[in-house]
From Swiss-Prot:
Family annotation (NCBIfam families): asp_carb_tr, PRK00856.1
GO molecular-function terms, A-Z: amino acid binding; aspartate carbamoyltransferase activity
Keywords from the UniProt entry: Pyrimidine biosynthesis, Transferase
A GO cellular component annotation in the UniProt record: cytosol
Species for this entry: Variovorax paradoxus (strain S110)
Disulfide bond residue pairs: none
Quaternary context: Heterododecamer (2C3:3R2) of six catalytic PyrB chains organized as two trimers (C3), and six regulatory PyrI chains organized as three dimers (R2).
Catalytic activity: carbamoyl phosphate + L-aspartate = N-carbamoyl-L-aspartate + phosphate + H(+)
Protein name as it appears in the record: Aspartate carbamoyltransferase catalytic subunit
Length: 320
């Protein structure tokens, strides 16, 4: 019954769209991570390509700005030998009032095989997935506050790379959880993979009330939240999504919740520090931590290419 209800899976329980980590079986999440591990060596080859998506057309539709996600999706698709089309939304018919579904219908008429979609409206990738032909696939590159599944997966890949097993890990997610689609995807992924304890850390104004129901421990002080942690995932303040005075100031936030080398000593000595980017140095994290030996922020970006290669190759290989 789970497979039939989940719009990401076909009747055989195979992944045909990646819309959210929520509801994905553990074996599919693990399969994506295992597949990504096989792709990490591609970047070391003289010819950085494999032929898995040769002849396929991948359309990147980013209705919100992006640097890391858009670029790594483009690199990933090209390394899979796909033809990549980056739609310039600012110059597209979307600015002339064309609806999202009409945009998709017209691009589908151009023989699109896979849409990578980032949109400010939660649920936009789901809507698209409901209206594309059976051979067309949709990957969510971030929708509103809802989900950012490939970021969640690359975060899990990073954690597994450095920590191997989730069963004994304590992971803290710190910062603007309220507006973070990454936090939600990370929480779903961590709980699916059997992480021992997930902590959500931030001021009451930036932690949604439903967090406890997601199986996490809520902490409102950084000291409590990161004490004896194995992994710390820092989140930026998403000022562009804030409509009210949720914080006194960025300086006050850094004083209370900013991760400094001194505060990092509360975590385990071999703890790793992660961040989905973009980083705001001196707001949620000190430069000395970003550039320090416990930071794995740049490896996250590198692993993101392999993870996105894995996702696209898997969904494109399955039919609805």
């Amino acid at each position: 019954m789970l497979y039939k209800r989940n719009p990401q899976l076909n009747k055989n329980g195979e992944l045909i769209h990646l819309l959210s980590i929520e509801g994905l079986p553990k074996d599919i999440v693990t399969h994506i991570l295992d597949t990504a591990a096989n792709f990490t060596s591609v970047s070391d080859r003289e010819v950085k390509k494999v032929p898995l998506l040769r002849g396929k057309s991948v359309f990147n539709l980013f209705f919100e700005n992006s640097t890391r996600t858009r670029t790594t999706f483009e690199i990933a698709a090209k390394r899979l030998s796909a033809d990549v089309i980056n739609l310039d939304i600012a110059r597209s018919s979307a600015t002339k009032g064309e609806s999202l579904l009409d945009t998709i219908a017209n691009l589908s008429a151009m023989a699109a095989d896979l849409f990578v979609v980032r949109h400010s409206e939660s649920g936009a990738p789901y809507l698209i997935a409901q209206h594309v032909a059976p051979h067309v696939h949709v990957v969510n590159a971030g929708d509103g506050r809802h989900a950012h599944p490939t970021q969640g997966l690359l975060d899990m890949y990073t954690i597994r790379h450095y920590k191997k097993d989730f069963a004994n890990l304590t992971v803290a997610i710190v910062g603007d959880v309220l507006h973070s689609r990454v936090a939600r995807s990370d929480i779903h992924a961590l709980t699916t993979l059997g992480c021992a304890e997930v902590r959500v850390v931030g001021p009451k104004t930036l932690v949604p009330g439903d967090m406890a129901g997601m199986g996490v421990r809520v902490c409102h002080t950084l000291e409590e939240g990161i004490r004896d942690c194995d992994v710390i995932i820092m989140l930026r303040l998403q000022n562009e999504r804030m409509s009210g005075a949720l914080l006194p100031s960025s300086q006050e936030f850094f004083k209370t919740y900013g991760l400094t080398p001194e505060k990092l000593q509360l975590a385990k000595s071999d703890a790793i520090v992660m961040h989905p980017g973009p980083i705001n140095r001196g707001v949620e994290i000190d430069s000395a931590v970003v550039d320090g030996k416990q930071s794995v922020i740049l490896p996250q970006v590198t692993f993101g290419i392999a993870v996105r290669m894995a996702v696209m190759s898997i969904v494109a290989g399955n039919e609805a």
